[in-house]
Amino acid sequence: MPMKFEFTFSKSHRPAGGSAVLLQVAGAKEPAGVAVVDPEGVLPKAAKIGKFSGKALSSLDIVAPHGSPADRIILLGLGDAAALTSHDWLKAGGAAAAKLRSADKATIFLDAPGVDVTGKAAADFALGMEMNAYAFDSYKTRKSDDESKSAQKVVKVTIVTGMVIAAKKAFATVQSIGEGVFLARDLVNEPANVLGPVEFAARAKELEKLGVEVETLTEREMKKLGMGALLGVAQGSSRPPRLVVMQWKGGKAKDKPLAFIGKGVVFDTGGISIKPASGMEEMKGDMGGAAAVTGLMHVLAARKASVNAVGIIGLVENMPDGSAQRPGDIVTSMSGQTIEVINTDAEGRLVLCDALWYCNDRFKPKAMIDLATLTGAIMVALSNHYAGLFSNDDRLAEQLLKAGTTTHERLWRMPLGKEYDKMIDSKFADMKNTGGRHGGSVTAAQFLKRFVKDTPWAHLDIAGTAMGSPTDEINQSWGSGFGVRLLDELVRANYES
């Protein structure tokens, strides 16, 4: 059942029935709120019998004892108080949400003895609850035998904390982050028959309501600009491509923007170099990079970030009809460099190279960061727990690595070098679009590097993290929204005036 939380922050609250969630750190004698919900003092014995010690994400769920104003009590562990991070508070909120699926109302006692609970921690806890509750089920006509399509469960949650004012302020900000993550998840989860390039562009245009300037380049306009690489990918589909440019002008007029570029292949059959049938349905998510960029632009605008930012997404469909490009074709990119197409399933880099060149040529950004579900090779190297980071700039790379650690959207830096560059030299053109099996994610990044000049640039290969990654306390969705929180943290920590 779709679930939504309505939050209230309060310094004190006496439950009138419902569930009470009491947080406790490892080693503490008692949890938060015990004086309110356990007047008879039975919780210590229950915790002992249930072997609950406050270990991170551990829980004990009991019927409320006689005399309690609550109907149900959930003890939830926070772990080591000294080591708590923002991500830990998110996970704790997600764990609480998972326990409250059958609840109608709940009281969360946040101020566990032994831990300094800030307003940001309270807000992160609430965001974690929302992230856990996200579900994409709009195409299910019935969720269960006794449930109509329109049913949505609303759980009223009171979060009890001494930092009410700070929590409310922080939650207003983190809610915008949640909205951006959910937008990215929605876009990745949407089926390709519903979300083509034109429809995706229309979704991006809705950001104008938040003050984002949005323009959409048509196929004709891209032809005039000479985007032969991007258009070559699109020519096998009856659905026309689009290039969407989103601008958020929250900084000083003279400041150069920070640029984010996303691969938006709304469905990838592989083209003439067609993919195997098994698992091909997941290629509706091959626009995870574009989804993350769109979600990020939503966040920056919604929270009125004091930065100038540009988001550019190249939207195409890679199909194998009679007009599709062939292995051996040579296309001319916007940069004037020619590319021999060895494998039509190495199409994302063809989309990105024109988008990167266009961005650099038009906006002269202070830095460019692209996101793409680019290679299966990165999944071989890193599985789906880290995204690959490639960069020509150590400072930018370190900023991204730190942001990844903070948000737990983790990155692992991969190499670039002349040796890899030689692997994409072509006998017939300036370069070829794949260097073969060995070092596949590296040669893909090396290809993109040829289109960024000397601008500080980073490439995030999110093929293993944007979709189908393992579920956890804050993500129960196939499409994860990976990259939105990471890049918002990057902006917040390094680029806002």
Swiss-Prot record:
Catalytic activity: Release of an N-terminal amino acid, Xaa-|-Yaa-, in which Xaa is preferably Leu, but may be other amino acids including Pro although not Arg or Lys, and Yaa may be Pro. Amino acid amides and methyl esters are also readily hydrolyzed, but rates on arylamides are exceedingly low; Release of an N-terminal amino acid, preferentially leucine, but not glutamic or aspartic acids
Keywords: Aminopeptidase, Cytoplasm, Hydrolase, Manganese, Metal-binding, Protease
GO molecular-function term, one example from the UniProt record: metalloaminopeptidase activity
Cellular component terms per the entry's GO annotation: cytoplasm
Gene3D superfamilies tied to this protein: Leucine Aminopeptidase, subunit E, domain 1, Zn peptidases
A biological process from GO: proteolysis
Primary location group: cytoplasm
Top-level taxon: Bacteria
Pfam families xref list: Peptidase_M17, Peptidase_M17_N
SUPFAM superfamilies recorded: Macro domain-like, Zn-dependent exopeptidases
Residues that coordinate or bind Mn(2+) 1: 268, 345, 347
Cofactor note: Binds 2 manganese ions per subunit.
Binding site for Mn(2+) 2: 263, 268, 286, 347
Cofactor(s) required, per the database record: Mn(2+)
EC numbers: 3.4.11.1, 3.4.11.10
Keyword Translocase in record: no
HAMAP family per the UniProt record, alphabetical: Cytosol_peptidase_M17 (MF_00181)
Family: Belongs to the peptidase M17 family.
Listed PANTHER family: CYTOSOL AMINOPEPTIDASE, LEUCINE AMINOPEPTIDASE-RELATED
Physiological role: Presumably involved in the processing and regular turnover of intracellular proteins. Catalyzes the removal of unsubstituted N-terminal amino acids from various peptides.
Protein's name according to its UniProt entry: Probable cytosol aminopeptidase
